[in-house]
Structure formats: C-alpha cells, structure tokens
Amino acid sequence: MPNKDVSLEREKKIIDWLNHCTPQAEAIYLVGDVFDFWFEYQRSVPKGFVRFLGTLANITDQGIPIYLFPGNHDLWVSDYLVKECGVTLIREAHEFMVEGKRFYVHHGDGLGPGDFSYKILKKIFTARSARFLFQWIHPNLGIALAHKLSKKSRLAQNPKEDHYLGNQKEHLSQFVSQHLASVSPPGEKPDFYIFGHRHLVLDVQLDTARYINLGEWLYGSQYAVFDGESLQLLQWPSQQPAKSQNQQSIGK
C-alpha cells in the first residue's frame, strides 16, 4: 500500500485535473481502476479518498454527469458512489453518441480472445456470493489483504506486456477488429473504442475506428478529450499531446 504522502499527492493531481475539466465538460468518463481496491461494507467504506469523492459530488451537483466503468481493481464498487456522489455506474460495455460520433467505452478487462484464467476469476469475484462472503471479513483485515494481493498482482505482471505487442497479439486490438467485423450496418460501427485496462497509452487505427487506451495515473497521467470534432490524448498537467506506445504520434 503506498505511503500516505504519495497517495495524497496522486489524489490532489487527479482532483486538479477534474477541476480543470469541469468548466468545459459536458460529461466525464472514468474507465476503471480508479481505486486500487474498493469494497462497500454495510456501514463503512475504505478511507483516504475524502477529497476525491467530494470533488465528484461537487461536479455532479453542477449537473455534469460522471460515468464510472469499474475495472478489475475496483470491480466491487457499488451504490455508495451512486448515492453519495451522484456517479452513474456502468458495468458493461456501453456506446455513446457524441456530436455524431459513436464511442464504445469499457474498462477493457475480459474482452477479446484468450486470458481464460482471468475471465474465470472475474466470474467468481463478481458473483454475489463472493461479495457476501467477503463482507464478513473485518474491514481492517479485508482491506489490508486486498491491497497486498493487488500489489502482488502488479509485481507479477509479465514484463513483455509493458509495451504494445502488435495488433495480432493484443487482446483488445483483436476484440476491436472482431467487433467491427460483426457490426451491421456499417453506419452503426463505433468511431472510437475507449479502454483503460491495458495501462498503456495507445492510439491504434483499426479499419475505420481508432482504438484508444488511456494509459494510467500511477506513474503517468494521461487523458482523452473530444471537442466535438477531434479526439486528443493529452498529458496532465502539461496538457501537451501524449505519445502512444505503439510508436504513433498522437494528439495532433
């Protein structure tokens, strides 16, 4: 679990970004792994996010919708953020029409071919019985255990997956290609696929669509902006174009 000062610095960074976006935003989309771990006990939630949660509530109070797609780290997000912060929770892939462009949005976990072990684990952990059983573990133990497992998961990540593997090996690239081929008529094909699970900054042209991966905020800080005409991937706080790790220059 990161130390308190580092966690607070990261929290302030994303709050600054949210406050920067709010005056111009018609909607804000958070595509998962916002929390390293989250579980809502009947009478308690994980501490340490007061400023962030207050910022979310302030934004939705202004009438700006915030859509949250839970990721594999925060898949147990439930109705606390909905009731207390006004966030709209979306668990499955969802399509949005914005200024005539179609956006396909999802965290990205479990999509595409392969990765069967994770898909099985996801079914287990998203089952109501798993949540019911976990709630009987005291929060002090349960949350500490979850953070330890999360850290172990990051350390065990295959170093070969720290860079773009190419369209034929990337699960999400394969998913986008397969999904595009399955959509009919052509006018209903998404223009953009927005994901976050890969934790790499990617901007990949696949047939008629762009596959965008938003990177991460643990070490980097990238985000996408759509102004009604074009989509840019930017770096925070510089607001300069981000560089995708599939060797394409993006944000132009």
Per-range role (PLM):
Residues N3-V98:
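Core catalytic region of metal-dependent phosphoesterases/phosphodiesterases
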Residues I28-G32, P65-N72, H106, F192-H197, ...:
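Active-site neighborhood of phospho(di)ester-bond hydrolases with catalytic His/Asp-centered motifs
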Residues L75-D79, V105-H106, G112-D115:
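Short, well-ordered, mixed-charge alpha-helical segments that flank or form enzyme active sites
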Residues A242-K252:
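C-terminal regulatory/interaction regions
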